[in-house]
Amino acid sequence: MCCKNEYQKRAHGEVERIFRELLPEAGLHVREEQIRLCHEMLDALMKNEITLCDAGVGIGKTYAYLTACILMRKYSVLHSGYSGCDGRPVVVSTSSIALQKAIIEEYVPFLSDVLLKADLLQGELKAVVRKGKEHFVCDYRLAQRLEAVRDKNKNQVQMEALKSLRHNFDLDSVHNLSGFDRRLGCVPKFCPRECPGKAGCRYQKHLDTSRKEDIFLQICNHNYLLADAMHRANGYRPLLADYRALVVDEAHKLPEAASQMYGRSIGKEDVQEISYFLSREHKGSEGKRLQEWFAALQEEIRKHRKDGIEDMAGKESFYFPPGAGSLLAQTKERLQLMIRRLAGNIPYWIFRRLEEMDELFGWFLKNDKRYILFLQQDSRGHLTFMAVNREIPKYLDATLWSRGFPAILTSGTLKAGNGFARTRQMTGLEKETGVRECVAESPFCYKENCLLYIPENLKPIKKGSREEAEQLAGQIRDLVCSTYGHTLVLFTSYILMGSVQQLLRDQIPFPMVQVWRNSQEEIARFKKMENAVLFAAGSCWEGVDFPGDMVSSLIIVKLPFSVPDPIHEAQREQYRSLESYIQTIVVPDMQKKLRQGFGRAIRTEQDTCVVSILDHRAAKKGKYRSDVLEALPKCRMAERIEEVEDFIRSRKVERYYS
């Protein structure tokens, strides 16, 4: 025991040296909370435990967990008595491609260089990104696609993107590639054994590299992590190499990924894809029938459906209308006949896609209680059949946490209110004992650099009314003028955003940019402008950085409560009272989303910003005032617009107004 304690002490001593000496010498700041966070993470890894780490904006959590993993590997042979050179990597799972790219191109090379120069490593750190086949180029299929479009009048930009795949293996790294070209040029779900391109296949070379014992980090997204876990649970070949520890960054997104992986869906694009692959097998007439049946079914559903409520992503969810049941049954019968006709005549993976569609239709017809069954309509009016498993936390526990490896789950929004109860519930850790919890506060001085403005004159107005849009437009106009532009306005509804923007079109003396559903081009345009107003919803609540004076005013129009949908209704059934459900589920989820939005305000130590909340429920006598203040960092408070003007004048220099 004494030896183990000594090795652990030495490992923690190296944390101090790395963050107090080596990284500052390389240009980074000393951050006490970052150091404390790394100690917590290292402790959990070396004691084979799970830790939940809520890391505030600007902490530098990536360096914290990478350093903890490096030292865990270095001292594991001494501390735990098993071979530290057994070839087992650490898996880092993230939600975003941007973070994966940053880890492999920036964080790992930088940290490796610093530690090598200090003789804390024997060799460079090696990492590889692992993701599904559909993210990589199949050279054989690419050659076929290029030949097919050689003499066609194809869009020149898309053509150049397609040609660039000869040199770019990762599809995610190529811009302007059409979705159709992407589907036709990617590695198929099942590679034929006698593939003529096998000898020089870049994908196979990538797999060979990723299996080498000198790979320290395997980086993947949450879906790939869960797919690997499902493979292991079902006795299939794992997708990832056996790993000694797991880091789940952006861990607040893990339950959403689990909903996708442990459920099933079928929409228009899925049907089109299946039809295309049927045509490649000379079964084009069958594919055409499939598309016709699905189109007719969608039309029948639209005739009988009841309106749903638009969520923050601009989608509507609603239950399957009974009036469309007879056509669904007829479509299922036709599909079963098609499956019998095609048995043994098409590749198994295409055949399995048809079987899965048949199973999903069957769940809807018999109202299978294992799943939350509903339809989802996107902004284009396309419908998707959705089946979400009711026991996602149970599956996460069974396929991940019960396997006994140490794990770090980290994000800026794991904590809600006073604790981690909601996160434990959603991630399957509710029944796990010995799970550690850590909160590392942001190093930013919010009391000095951030003003929280909640107007004193807010009043409840009928939701969706003209009066509501007019009141909000007036408040936003006054704020934009008070802060001289430099504004991000976050909405929870695209409909409300459109209404308010129309009212303000001729009232704001600054350029206005409106982001509709993941429009990266519009965000890039806003960033190039010296001073503008960005209206946004959906994905802009998180994962988008606007450092400096670009966003000096963040306006949160409505508190980000989840809309009532079939998933939330199913959760509501588990509680005896509505109030209990609201306090246990609804409020913590709102607090997490609010913190994500608030995080767009201050991105560096030098940033200064006014954050305004225009929802009467956050006002002094509002129902959720205490919940709002509990979720946010301590800031100076304001109720009058004059205080906003004074704050901006006191914090900004002359060029801000030019």
Indicate where each model-derived feature is located.
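A substrate-engagement module of RecA-like helicase motors
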Residues: C2-P24, H29, S76-Q218, H222, ...
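Walker A/P-loop
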Residues: K47-T67
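Signature of the SF2 helicase/ATPase Hel1-core->accessory helical subdomain module
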Residues: Y65-T67, L71, A98-K101, E105-L111, ...
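Conserved RecA-like ASCE P-loop NTPase motor core of nucleic-acid helicases/translocases
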Residues: R88-A98, I408-G412, G485-T492, I613-L614
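Conserved interdomain hinge at the start of the Helicase C-terminal
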Residues: A398, N457-T492
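Conserved helicase motor "Helicase C" RecA-like lobe of SF1/SF2 P-loop NTPases
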Residues: T492-W516
